[in-house]
Protein backbone atom coordinates (compact mmCIF):
# COMPACT_ATOMS: atom_id res chain seq x y z
CA UNK A 1 0.00 0.00 0.00
CA UNK A 2 1.10 3.60 -0.67
CA UNK A 3 0.34 6.80 1.19
CA UNK A 4 -0.81 9.85 -0.74
CA UNK A 5 -0.76 13.51 0.40
CA UNK A 6 -3.85 15.59 1.06
CA UNK A 7 -3.22 19.31 1.46
CA UNK A 8 -5.53 21.44 3.61
CA UNK A 9 -5.51 25.16 4.34
CA UNK A 10 -6.99 26.68 7.49
CA UNK A 11 -7.49 30.31 8.39
CA UNK A 12 -5.81 30.99 11.73
CA UNK A 13 -5.60 34.50 13.19
CA UNK A 14 -6.24 35.98 9.78
CA UNK A 15 -3.55 34.00 7.95
CA UNK A 16 -3.62 30.89 5.81
CA UNK A 17 -1.93 27.90 7.45
CA UNK A 18 -1.23 24.86 5.30
CA UNK A 19 -1.02 21.27 6.55
CA UNK A 20 -0.31 17.98 4.79
CA UNK A 21 -1.70 14.63 5.86
CA UNK A 22 -1.01 11.31 4.17
CA UNK A 23 -3.69 8.67 3.68
CA UNK A 24 -3.34 5.07 2.65
CA UNK A 25 -4.18 4.38 -0.98
CA UNK A 26 -5.07 1.16 -2.79
CA UNK A 27 -1.97 0.97 -4.97
CA UNK A 28 0.75 3.03 -6.63
CA UNK A 29 -0.21 6.43 -8.09
CA UNK A 30 -1.41 6.58 -11.68
CA UNK A 31 0.54 9.77 -12.32
CA UNK A 32 4.31 10.42 -12.15
CA UNK A 33 5.59 10.64 -8.59
CA UNK A 34 8.72 10.69 -6.48
CA UNK A 35 9.65 9.74 -2.93
CA UNK A 36 11.32 12.38 -0.75
CA UNK A 37 12.25 10.32 2.27
CA UNK A 38 8.93 8.78 3.37
CA UNK A 39 6.88 11.36 1.45
CA UNK A 40 5.17 10.56 -1.83
CA UNK A 41 5.23 13.63 -4.09
CA UNK A 42 3.08 13.90 -7.22
CA UNK A 43 5.00 15.42 -10.14
CA UNK A 44 3.18 17.97 -12.25
CA UNK A 45 5.96 20.38 -13.24
CA UNK A 46 9.09 18.20 -13.38
CA UNK A 47 10.04 15.03 -15.21
CA UNK A 48 11.01 12.08 -12.98
CA UNK A 49 14.63 11.01 -13.41
CA UNK A 50 16.34 7.76 -12.41
CA UNK A 51 19.84 9.17 -12.83
CA UNK A 52 22.17 9.57 -9.83
CA UNK A 53 23.56 13.08 -9.34
CA UNK A 54 25.45 14.96 -6.65
CA UNK A 55 22.80 17.56 -5.83
CA UNK A 56 19.04 17.99 -5.85
CA UNK A 57 19.57 21.19 -7.85
CA UNK A 58 21.24 19.17 -10.62
CA UNK A 59 17.74 17.83 -11.30
CA UNK A 60 15.33 20.72 -10.85
CA UNK A 61 17.59 23.19 -12.68
CA UNK A 62 16.93 21.17 -15.85
CA UNK A 63 13.23 20.57 -15.18
CA UNK A 64 13.66 17.15 -13.58
CA UNK A 65 12.93 15.63 -10.18
CA UNK A 66 14.90 12.72 -8.69
CA UNK A 67 12.88 9.52 -8.51
CA UNK A 68 14.07 8.84 -4.96
CA UNK A 69 15.61 11.29 -2.49
CA UNK A 70 17.08 10.74 0.96
CA UNK A 71 16.83 7.94 3.45
CA UNK A 72 14.41 5.07 2.96
CA UNK A 73 14.11 1.49 1.81
CA UNK A 74 15.45 2.56 -1.59
CA UNK A 75 18.61 3.90 -3.22
CA UNK A 76 18.64 7.70 -3.40
CA UNK A 77 19.18 9.44 -6.73
CA UNK A 78 20.75 12.36 -4.82
CA UNK A 79 24.12 11.61 -3.25
CA UNK A 80 24.41 11.97 0.55
CA UNK A 81 26.63 14.70 2.02
CA UNK A 82 30.27 13.82 2.73
CA UNK A 83 29.83 14.59 6.44
CA UNK A 84 27.32 15.70 9.08
CA UNK A 85 29.40 18.01 11.28
CA UNK A 86 26.46 19.25 13.35
CA UNK A 87 24.79 15.95 14.23
CA UNK A 88 26.02 16.13 17.83
CA UNK A 89 24.68 19.66 18.30
CA UNK A 90 21.40 18.75 16.62
CA UNK A 91 20.99 15.82 19.02
CA UNK A 92 21.62 18.10 22.01
CA UNK A 93 19.16 20.75 20.81
CA UNK A 94 16.60 18.03 20.11
CA UNK A 95 16.26 17.56 23.88
CA UNK A 96 15.78 21.25 24.66
CA UNK A 97 12.58 23.26 24.76
CA UNK A 98 11.57 26.18 22.57
CA UNK A 99 11.60 28.52 25.57
CA UNK A 100 15.33 27.82 26.03
CA UNK A 101 15.84 29.83 22.84
CA UNK A 102 12.96 32.30 22.60
CA UNK A 103 14.00 34.10 25.79
CA UNK A 104 17.02 35.47 23.90
CA UNK A 105 16.28 37.75 20.92
CA UNK A 106 19.14 36.60 18.68
CA UNK A 107 18.63 32.88 19.32
CA UNK A 108 14.92 33.38 18.68
CA UNK A 109 15.70 35.03 15.36
CA UNK A 110 18.15 32.26 14.45
CA UNK A 111 15.51 29.52 14.69
CA UNK A 112 12.79 31.65 13.04
CA UNK A 113 14.26 30.82 9.64
CA UNK A 114 12.84 29.36 7.40
CA UNK A 115 9.31 29.28 8.87
CA UNK A 116 9.16 32.95 9.84
CA UNK A 117 8.50 31.98 13.46
CA UNK A 118 10.67 30.17 16.04
CA UNK A 119 10.59 26.39 15.83
CA UNK A 120 12.71 23.38 16.82
CA UNK A 121 10.79 21.04 14.52
CA UNK A 122 13.72 20.53 12.14
CA UNK A 123 15.96 19.52 15.04
CA UNK A 124 13.34 17.07 16.30
CA UNK A 125 13.11 15.42 12.89
CA UNK A 126 16.90 15.29 12.45
CA UNK A 127 17.93 14.11 15.91
CA UNK A 128 19.23 10.55 16.13
CA UNK A 129 17.86 10.40 19.68
CA UNK A 130 14.25 11.13 18.74
CA UNK A 131 12.55 8.33 16.84
CA UNK A 132 9.22 8.69 15.06
CA UNK A 133 7.53 6.29 12.70
CA UNK A 134 7.02 7.21 9.07
CA UNK A 135 3.30 7.86 9.56
CA UNK A 136 4.18 10.88 11.71
CA UNK A 137 7.35 11.90 9.90
CA UNK A 138 5.82 12.14 6.42
CA UNK A 139 3.09 14.52 7.58
CA UNK A 140 5.59 16.70 9.44
CA UNK A 141 8.18 16.80 6.65
CA UNK A 142 5.67 17.75 3.97
CA UNK A 143 3.95 20.32 6.18
CA UNK A 144 7.24 21.99 7.14
CA UNK A 145 8.34 22.17 3.50
CA UNK A 146 5.12 23.87 2.44
CA UNK A 147 5.00 26.26 5.39
CA UNK A 148 8.63 27.26 4.86
CA UNK A 149 8.00 28.17 1.22
CA UNK A 150 4.61 29.77 1.92
CA UNK A 151 3.09 27.60 -0.81
CA UNK A 152 -0.45 26.40 -0.19
CA UNK A 153 -1.19 24.06 -3.07
CA UNK A 154 1.96 22.39 -4.42
CA UNK A 155 4.13 19.93 -2.50
CA UNK A 156 6.43 19.32 -5.47
CA UNK A 157 7.44 22.97 -5.76
CA UNK A 158 7.69 23.27 -1.98
CA UNK A 159 10.53 20.74 -1.79
CA UNK A 160 12.31 22.49 -4.66
CA UNK A 161 11.71 25.87 -3.04
CA UNK A 162 12.98 24.68 0.33
CA UNK A 163 16.26 23.50 -1.16
CA UNK A 164 16.63 26.85 -2.92
CA UNK A 165 16.07 28.58 0.43
CA UNK A 166 18.70 26.37 2.06
CA UNK A 167 21.23 27.18 -0.66
CA UNK A 168 20.51 30.91 -0.52
CA UNK A 169 20.91 31.07 3.27
CA UNK A 170 24.01 28.88 3.13
CA UNK A 171 25.70 31.27 0.70
CA UNK A 172 24.78 34.21 2.95
CA UNK A 173 26.21 32.45 6.03
CA UNK A 174 29.33 31.16 4.29
CA UNK A 175 28.44 27.46 4.46
CA UNK A 176 29.98 24.97 2.04
CA UNK A 177 27.19 23.92 -0.34
CA UNK A 178 28.67 20.44 -0.75
CA UNK A 179 27.39 19.73 2.77
CA UNK A 180 23.83 20.60 1.69
CA UNK A 181 23.11 18.59 -1.48
CA UNK A 182 19.37 18.20 -0.86
CA UNK A 183 19.70 14.60 0.27
CA UNK A 184 17.91 15.21 3.60
CA UNK A 185 16.18 18.59 3.59
CA UNK A 186 15.12 18.48 7.25
CA UNK A 187 18.69 17.83 8.40
CA UNK A 188 20.04 20.48 6.05
CA UNK A 189 17.68 23.12 7.46
CA UNK A 190 18.84 22.11 10.96
CA UNK A 191 22.48 22.37 9.77
CA UNK A 192 21.92 25.95 8.59
CA UNK A 193 20.04 26.75 11.81
CA UNK A 194 23.05 25.50 13.81
CA UNK A 195 25.31 27.96 12.02
CA UNK A 196 22.78 30.74 12.57
CA UNK A 197 22.59 29.86 16.28
CA UNK A 198 26.38 29.82 16.68
CA UNK A 199 26.66 33.19 14.96
CA UNK A 200 23.77 34.64 16.97
CA UNK A 201 24.80 33.26 20.36
CA UNK A 202 27.73 35.63 20.84
CA UNK A 203 25.31 38.56 20.79
CA UNK A 204 23.03 37.09 23.45
CA UNK A 205 25.92 35.81 25.59
CA UNK A 206 27.20 39.35 26.04
CA UNK A 207 23.78 40.47 27.30
CA UNK A 208 22.83 37.42 29.37
CA UNK A 209 23.04 37.82 33.14
CA UNK A 210 22.97 34.05 33.65
CA UNK A 211 23.46 31.86 30.54
CA UNK A 212 21.00 28.98 30.31
CA UNK A 213 21.59 25.47 28.97
CA UNK A 214 21.12 26.54 25.34
CA UNK A 215 23.72 29.31 25.53
CA UNK A 216 26.16 27.09 27.42
CA UNK A 217 25.89 24.33 24.80
CA UNK A 218 26.35 26.84 21.98
CA UNK A 219 29.37 28.42 23.70
CA UNK A 220 30.99 25.00 24.14
CA UNK A 221 30.28 24.02 20.54
CA UNK A 222 31.63 27.33 19.28
CA UNK A 223 34.90 26.92 21.19
CA UNK A 224 35.32 23.37 19.92
CA UNK A 225 34.66 24.31 16.28
CA UNK A 226 36.93 27.35 16.37
CA UNK A 227 39.82 25.15 17.45
CA UNK A 228 39.15 22.15 15.20
CA UNK A 229 36.87 23.13 12.28
CA UNK A 230 36.70 26.94 12.09
CA UNK A 231 35.27 26.85 8.56
CA UNK A 232 32.09 25.26 9.94
CA UNK A 233 31.30 28.54 11.72
CA UNK A 234 30.61 30.20 8.39
CA UNK A 235 31.15 33.84 7.51
CA UNK A 236 30.12 35.22 10.91
CA UNK A 237 28.07 38.09 9.47
CA UNK A 238 25.15 37.94 11.88
CA UNK A 239 23.19 41.19 12.17
CA UNK A 240 22.42 41.63 15.89
CA UNK A 241 18.85 41.82 17.09
CA UNK A 242 18.70 44.63 19.62
CA UNK A 243 16.38 43.77 22.54
CA UNK A 244 13.68 46.37 23.13
CA UNK A 245 14.22 48.81 25.96
CA UNK A 246 11.57 48.17 28.63
CA UNK A 247 9.11 50.96 29.22
CA UNK A 248 9.72 52.85 32.44
CA UNK A 249 6.66 54.38 33.99
CA UNK A 250 7.38 57.82 35.38
CA UNK A 251 5.34 59.04 38.26
CA UNK A 252 3.44 62.11 37.19
CA UNK A 253 4.07 65.15 39.27
CA UNK A 254 1.06 66.54 41.02
CA UNK A 255 0.04 69.88 39.68
CA UNK A 256 0.41 72.75 42.16
CA UNK A 257 -2.53 75.02 42.75
CA UNK A 258 -0.25 77.97 43.37
CA UNK A 259 1.67 77.71 40.09
CA UNK A 260 4.97 77.86 42.02
CA UNK A 261 4.11 80.89 44.16
CA UNK A 262 4.01 80.73 47.96
CA UNK A 263 1.43 82.70 49.81
CA UNK A 264 2.80 84.79 52.74
CA UNK A 265 0.54 85.83 55.55
Swiss-Prot record:
Result when mutating residue 82 to A: No effect on filament formation
GO MF annotation, one: protein serine/threonine kinase inhibitor activity
Outcome when changing residue 150 to A: Partially disrupts filament formation
Effect of residue 235 to A: Partially disrupts filament formation
Outcome when changing residue 84 to A: No effect on filament formation
Effect seen on changing residue 168 to A: Partially disrupts filament formation
Effect of residue 30 to A: No effect on filament formation
One Pfam family in the UniProt entry: NSs
Effect on the protein of changing residue 240 to A: No effect on filament formation
GO biological process: negative stranded viral RNA replication; symbiont-mediated perturbation of host cell-cell junction; symbiont-mediated perturbation of host cytoskeleton; symbiont-mediated suppression of host gene expression; symbiont-mediated suppression of host innate immune response; symbiont-mediated suppression of host PKR/eIFalpha signaling; symbiont-mediated suppression of host transcription; symbiont-mediated suppression of host transcription initiation from RNA polymerase II promoter
Residues spanning the membrane: none
Annotated compartments: Host nucleus; Host cytoplasm
Record motif OmegaXaV, residues: 261-265
UniProt keyword annotation of Methyltransferase present: no
Annotated stretches, region: Disordered: 249-265
Post-translational events: Phosphorylated.
Function statement: Plays a role in the escape of host innate immune response by promoting the degradation of host EIF2AK2/PKR and inhibiting host transcription. Cytoplasmic NSs interacts with host FBXW11 to degrade PKR whereas nuclear pool binds to host FBXO3 to target TFIIH subunit GTF2H1 for proteasomal degradation with the help of the linker protein SKP1. Removes FBXO3 isoform 1 from the nucleus. Forms nuclear amyloid-like filaments of about 12 nm in width that may sequester NSs binding partners, causing cell cycle arrest. Also aggragates in the cytosol as short fibrils late after host cell infection.
Recorded domain comment: The C-terminus disordered region is involved in multimerization, filament formation, but not nuclear localization. OmegaXaV motif is required for both nuclear filament formation and degradation of host GTF2H1. This motif also mediates FBXW11 binding.
Subunit structure: Multimerizes; forms 0.5-1 mm thick proteinaceous filaments in the nucleus. Interacts (via omegaXaV motif) with host FBXW11; this interaction is important for EIF2AK2/PKR degradation. Interacts (via omegaXaV motif) with host GTF2H1. Interacts with the host E3 ubiquitin ligase component FBXO3 (via ApaG domain); this interaction is important for GTF2H1 degradation.
Family under the similarity heading: Belongs to the phlebovirus NS-S protein family.
Protein name as catalogued: Non-structural protein S
Amino acid sequence: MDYFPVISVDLQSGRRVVSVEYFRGDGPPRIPYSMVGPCCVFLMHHRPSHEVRLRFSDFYNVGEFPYRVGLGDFASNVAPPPAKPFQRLIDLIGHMTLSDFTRFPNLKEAISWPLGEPSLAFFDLSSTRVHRNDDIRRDQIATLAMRSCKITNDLEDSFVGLHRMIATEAILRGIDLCLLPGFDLMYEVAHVQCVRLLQAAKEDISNAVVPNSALIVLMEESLMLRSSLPSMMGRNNWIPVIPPIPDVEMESEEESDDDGFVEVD
